[in-house]
């Protein structure tokens, strides 16, 4: 056990943690050169295409150190994107240390900071590594100072390495062995194993990734999931080298996978504790905090026959992604579907793409909203995650919107633009600290503004140099209203949105104009209106297509023409009372892009 080291790799997006993991695997001979490929741990096609890590992956390697001992290194590669910070906190719960990878050209960024503080809160040993040292723009000395200034950990002896060329990788491994403590735990105690992650395999059922804290787990053991109290037989267990390799036992301090023929998706929840059925532990291991979704959106299958398949797909996906929340919902415009909760917009996009790719579904998404706290006139407080659930105006005493605390790290030259952007998003500055050329800004910005397009706008105003980390702070009273879109005086529930009163007229007008472009012309006029309650704030009309009924009248009497026009008018009137308007799929997506251009 003294020779085991468990650690995670944490870093900002694109600072090279997946490439560093590749080098560690190669150096320790986890895979032969033939099997080696770039970003070997990003196993999902989506991860490779976008060049980001979405799921944390674990690997067990054996490293013969300079002191002659062979060490077992269990490491977990984590995502760097702010939407997947939950994956990071899960991975850190299973480790004793973390490698903080910082790009020697870019320096410290907001996500580096956020993940690093999470690690320090969990009492992990943080080992700084300066990566991309081979770049002409690399300034390791400046970045080392920055790490000390901003993060507050000693970085003078930080290893300089280049994951791409393989320079300095040996030193990184030596640092891991020397600086990260060995796991603590009692091999004789009853088994306690923390479930870090689970996923569904069509042949094996539920596969769980576990970290053994106390005791050991062998093939054929009878184990029990502590919160549900259900017992299972251990069929297979093993480690990842990144390939799945079977072993007969996982000892104290090790990280590996376990298959117990669990068919029920909820059988082994992430963050739960496994123990032996007969010789069981008395208390559950401290898991990790359950995250609350920040963004909600309705997902509906385009054809209603796919509803069952969609439900099963969500179940399997939520096993693999514990931060996904879903509940059934039905809409008059779109039929049956699910209301899903996500951690952010990137998370929402990724989930939608995974459902469409891995489970072959066609889905429509409604506009994302955040959760509002509504105080009703009868004194009751309710939480609203969808505009259609908002009670009538007469029953509402006040609406409170969620406020996010945004920490940004910004280069000096872009400060002006970013302050303008934050003010436009109704932000209030709470702090500003200069660290050399970087400025740490703290703003309180309504969550609804942050999740929509704040991140994209922040990146474009700062040419990609500013970085952001946000977290929910509190609910605060605000003047929010619900804008309904009416087509031929019928409300379309899927197009409603909750906005601040000051922006309502502008957002309503913009949406109405957008809908006008997207709804095809019919044989009669279509009125598109935006309304707050019964008060219309914007209107636009899609003009009718009409046949020229006078084409065959040459000269002749005017009363003949009047008769034909009158007849056409009556026909149109009858049509309008009977006709209904098909709203195309693009129109629902238009909401997502209102205010972006």
From Swiss-Prot:
GO biological process entries: positive regulation of translation
Positions with a binding annotation for GTP: 14-19, 131-134
UniProt topology in membrane: Peripheral membrane protein
Keywords for the protein's UniProt record, in alphabetical order: Cell inner membrane, Cell membrane, GTP-binding, Hydrolase, Membrane, Nucleotide-binding, Protein biosynthesis
Gene3D superfamilies, A to Z: 3.30.70.240, Elongation factor 4, C-terminal domain, Elongation Factor G (Translational Gtpase), domain 3, P-loop containing nucleotide triphosphate hydrolases, Translation factors
Any Pfam family: LepA_C
Signal peptide, first to last residue: none
The enzyme's E.C. designation: 3.6.5.n1
Highest taxon listed in the record's lineage: Bacteria
Subcellular locations according to the entry: Cell inner membrane
Disulfide bonds, paired cysteine numbers: none
Chief place where the protein resides: membrane
Enzyme class, broadest EC rank: hydrolase
HAMAP family, A to Z: LepA
Similarity comment: family membership: Belongs to the TRAFAC class translation factor GTPase superfamily. Classic translation factor GTPase family. LepA subfamily.
Cited function: Required for accurate and efficient protein synthesis under certain stress conditions. May act as a fidelity factor of the translation reaction, by catalyzing a one-codon backward translocation of tRNAs on improperly translocated ribosomes. Back-translocation proceeds from a post-translocation (POST) complex to a pre-translocation (PRE) complex, thus giving elongation factor G a second chance to translocate the tRNAs correctly. Binds to ribosomes in a GTP-dependent manner.
Protein name as it appears in the record: Elongation factor 4
Species this protein is from: Haemophilus ducreyi (strain 35000HP / ATCC 700724)
Lineage, opening ranks: Bacteria, Pseudomonadati, Pseudomonadota, Gammaproteobacteria, Pasteurellales
């Amino acid at each position: 056990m003294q020779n085991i080291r468990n650690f995670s790799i944490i870093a900002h997006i694109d600072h090279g943690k997946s490439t560093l993991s590749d080098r560690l695997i190669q150096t320790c001979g986890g895979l032969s050169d033939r099997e080696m490929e770039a970003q070997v741990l990003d196993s999902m096609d989506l991860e490779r295409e976008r060049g980001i890590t979405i799921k944390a992956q674990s690997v067990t390697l054996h490293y013969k150190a300079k002191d002659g001992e062979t060490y077992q290194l269990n490491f977990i590669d984590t995502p760097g994107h702010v939407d997947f910070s939950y994956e990071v906190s899960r991975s850190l719960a299973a480790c004793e240390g973390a490698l903080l990878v910082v790009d020697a050209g870019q320096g410290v960024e907001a996500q580096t900071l956020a993940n690093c503080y999470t690690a320090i809160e969990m009492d992990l040993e943080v080992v700084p590594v300066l990566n991309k040292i081979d770049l002409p723009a690399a300034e390791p000395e400046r970045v080392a100072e920055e790490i000390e200034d901003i993060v507050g950990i000693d970085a003078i002896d930080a290893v300089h390495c280049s994951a791409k060329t393989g320079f300095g990788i040996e030193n990184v491994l030596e640092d891991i062995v020397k600086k990260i403590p060995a796991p603590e735990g009692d091999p004789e105690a009853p088994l306690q194993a923390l479930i870090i992650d689970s996923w569904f395999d069509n042949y094996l059922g539920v596969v769980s990734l576990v970290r053994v804290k106390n005791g050991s787990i062998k093939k054929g053991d009878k184990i029990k999931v502590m919160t549900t109290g259900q017992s299972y037989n251990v069929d297979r267990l093993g480690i990842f080298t990144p390939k799945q390799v079977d072993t007969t036992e996982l000892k104290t301090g090790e990280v590996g996978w376990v298959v117990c023929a669990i068919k029920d998706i909820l059988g082994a929840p992430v963050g739960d504790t496994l123990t032996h059925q007969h010789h069981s532990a008395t208390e559950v291991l401290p898991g990790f905090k359950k995250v609350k979704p920040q963004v909600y959106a309705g997902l509906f299958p385009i054809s209603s026959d796919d509803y069952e398949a969609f439900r099963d797909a969500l179940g399997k996906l939520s096993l693999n992604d514990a931060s996904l929340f879903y509940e059934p919902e039905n809409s008059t415009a779109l039929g049956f579907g699910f209301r899903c909760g996500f951690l952010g917009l990137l998370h929402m996009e990724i989930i939608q793409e995974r459902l469409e790719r891995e489970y072959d579904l066609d889905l429509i998404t409604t506009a994302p909203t955040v959760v509002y706290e509504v105080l009703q006139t009868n004194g009751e407080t309710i939480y609203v995650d969808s505009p259609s659930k908002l009670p009538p105006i007469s029953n509402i005493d006040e609406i409170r919107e969620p406020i996010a605390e945004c920490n940004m790290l910004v280069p000096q030259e872009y400060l002006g633009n970013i302050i303008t952007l934050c003010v436009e998003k109704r932000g209030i500055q709470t702090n500003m600290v200069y660290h050399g050329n970087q400025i740490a800004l703290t703003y309180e910005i309504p969550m609804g503004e942050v999740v929509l397009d704040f991140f994209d706008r922040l990146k474009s105003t700062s040419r990609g140099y500013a970085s952001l980390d946000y977290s929910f702070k509190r609910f605060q009273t605000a003047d929010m209203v619900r804008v309904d879109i009416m087509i031929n005086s019928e409300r379309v529930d899927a197009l409603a949105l909750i906005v601040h009163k000051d922006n309502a007229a502008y957002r309503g007008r913009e949406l109405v104009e957008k809908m006008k472009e997207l709804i095809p012309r019919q044989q009669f006029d279509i009125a598109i209106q935006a309304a707050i309650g019964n008060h219309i704030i914007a209107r636009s009309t899609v003009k009718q297509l009409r046949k020229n009924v006078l084409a065959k009248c040459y000269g002749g009497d005017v009363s003949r023409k009047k008769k034909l026009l009158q007849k056409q008018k009556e026909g149109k009137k009858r049509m309008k009372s009977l006709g209904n308007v098909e709203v195309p799929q693009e129109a629902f997506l238009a909401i997502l892009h209102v205010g972006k251009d």
